[in-house]
């Protein structure tokens, strides 16, 4: 089974062909094709090739499924005996992609 590790938006993802991954928002239309070129490592047929920092000639092709926002995450801070509190919400914008091909 071949897999790849790539970097996008300051995070690293391990994927195989056919995986569905949530990436940071990319402002792409559904069905658009995306190339991810910051590939850190590729494993094909049990042979691992690591890059310094990226693997030369390696790329990952993906198809955009949709864009959306995650569920709201609430952060709440309360300072005891001070009658002071803070409530803040956060929703992450994401692009859902399907990995179609790993080229190494």
Curated annotation (Swiss-Prot):
One Pfam family hit: Ribosomal_L21p
> Cellular component GO terms, alphabetically?
cytoplasm; ribonucleoprotein complex; ribosome
What GO molecular function annotations does the UniProt record carry, in alphabetical order?
Answer: rRNA binding; structural constituent of ribosome
- Record-linked InterPro entries: bL21-like, bL21-like_sf, Ribosomal_bL21, Ribosomal_bL21_CS
Q: Name one GO biological process term.
A: translation
Instruction: List UniProt keywords, sorted A-Z.
Output: Ribonucleoprotein, Ribosomal protein, RNA-binding, rRNA-binding
Function according to Swiss-Prot or TrEMBL:
This protein binds to 23S rRNA in the presence of protein L20.
What interactions and quaternary structure are annotated?
Answer: Part of the 50S ribosomal subunit. Contacts protein L20.
Checking PANTHER family in the record gives: 50S RIBOSOMAL PROTEIN L21, LARGE RIBOSOMAL SUBUNIT PROTEIN BL21M
Q: What family does the database annotate?
A: Belongs to the bacterial ribosomal protein bL21 family.
Task: State what protein this is by name.
Answer: Large ribosomal subunit protein bL21
